[in-house]
Structure formats: C-alpha cells, structure tokens
Design a protein with these regions (language model features):
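A short helix->loop->beta-strand "cap" motif at the edges of active sites that frequently abuts
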Residues: 6-11, 29-33, 107-108, 167-177, ...
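Phosphate-coordination loops involved in phosphoryl transfer and adenosine-cofactor binding
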Residues: 9, 83-86, 159, 175-176
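Phosphate-binding beta-alpha-beta segment of Rossmann-like dinucleotide-binding domains, i.e.
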Residues: 30, 38-86, 101, 105
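Glycine-rich Rossmann-fold phosphate-binding loop(s) that bind the pyrophosphate
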Residues: 92-93
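Short beta-strand "acidic-cap" motif of Rossmann-like dinucleotide-binding folds
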Residues: 110-112
Length: 205
C-alpha cells in the first residue's frame, strides 16, 4: 500500500541488513530498487551482543530492577563467569566474528553453525565449525544468533533445540543456559522461548 501510494519513489534504502520488512515483490513490480547497508552497524551490534552476554550472566537487569524497587537481593543474584564457557554462534559472519574475538579474549571457547562459511575462516578465528546446528546447542551454554532470516532459519531456535543445551559450562560449573539474538525476530520461536524461561530451561534471553 505504501509503495502504491508513492508513484515517484525510485529507491528504498534499509539502514541495516534484513529486508524482510519490505515488500520486495511490490517494489520489483514498481521498478523500485531496494538496497541494504551491510557493515554499517557491525561494531555497534558486536558491542551490544557482548553487553547482553555480560548482563544475562551477571543478572544485571534483575539487579537494576530490584534496586529501583527498593529491594536488596545481592545474595539471590549469584552470577557466573563467561570465561571457561562455550559460546555457540548461529551464523558466523562479520558480527559473529567480532563477538568471537571479544569472547575469545574473555576466555570463552568458540563454536559455530554456518553452512555457507569456508572452513578456513572459522579456523583463522579459532572457532570450531559444526555441520549440524544441533551439535552447537548440545555443547554450548551461551548461544548468539547472527544469521539472516530465511525459510531455512525460520524458528531455528525452538523448544527442541533449546532443550539440548547443557546448562553446565566446559569448566564443569553450573551456569544455566543463555540466549542472545541480535538478528531478525523470526529466527526464534518466541512462544517456545517464553516456555523455556518459565520452566528454567533458559536462564535468560
């Protein structure tokens, strides 16, 4: 409807990577060029992902919320360290590789599922590349989503894959399971994630 009401429109520019919120068929039929801007926010998303990883593992949002409501719940908020844990990437492009470099410096072990990534790139990043996405969920207590939304990745994160996560780090310490998604929403089945949070399959998301 918006495209039909813009007869002089010649270009739609997306400030980001995903274009699933643009009617590509309608744009094509109207002769309108659609472009995205890959790389424009890479570092910002890298830092946001690291922030979410730290916040979830250290219960920072809960601590902030409790303190603002007048509660002092220090003893109830026992966080764990990222060091010694495995992080699994779903998609290992520019953003995931940037997150991986920081995670590696912290002391995390890197794993990834990306069927389109050359093995040598994963090797250069000291990341174990898996052919089966389920292996990443089985091995990792921290999952970071950095892939495009497609028919292949729609609801890739669901009750079945979440139930595979171990909850125990590579260092043998109980740390719970943590999910960070800085990609398109449709990759995650939100109802399954909510249920996983309620039954504590997931510690945070």
């Amino acid at each position: 409807e918006a495209i039909a009401n813009a007869p002089t429109l010649r270009l739609i520019g997306r400030a980001g990577v995903g274009v699933d919120n643009i009617d590509l068929d309608a744009a094509t039929n109207a002769g309108i060029l659609v472009c995205n801007t890959p790389g424009s926010s890479t570092q910002s998303v890298v830092e946001l992902t690291i922030g979410h990883l730290l916040a979830s593992t250290r219960h920072i949002p809960t601590a902030d919320r409790d303190l603002r409501s007048g509660k002092w719940t220090k003893k109830a908020l026992k966080g764990t360290e990222l060091s010694g844990k495995r992080i699994g990437f779903i998609g290992f492009g520019r953003i995931a590789q940037g997150v991986g470099r920081v995670a590696k410096a912290i002391g995390m072990e890197l794993h990834a599922y990306d069927p389109y990534l050359p093995m040598e790139i994963a090797t250069e990043q000291d990341c174990t590349l898996h052919a089966d996405v389920n292996d990443v969920f089985r091995m990792c207590t921290h999952i970071a989503i950095h892939c495009n939304l497609s028919e292949e990745t729609h609801h890739l994160v669901n009750a079945e894959t979440l139930s595979m996560m171990p909850g125990i780090g590579a260092d043998g310490n109980l740390c719970g399971n943590h999910l960070v998604s800085c990609a398109r929403g449709g990759i995650v089945n939100e109802n399954d994630v909510l249920l996983a949070l309620e039954n504590e399959t997931l510690s945070s998301c």
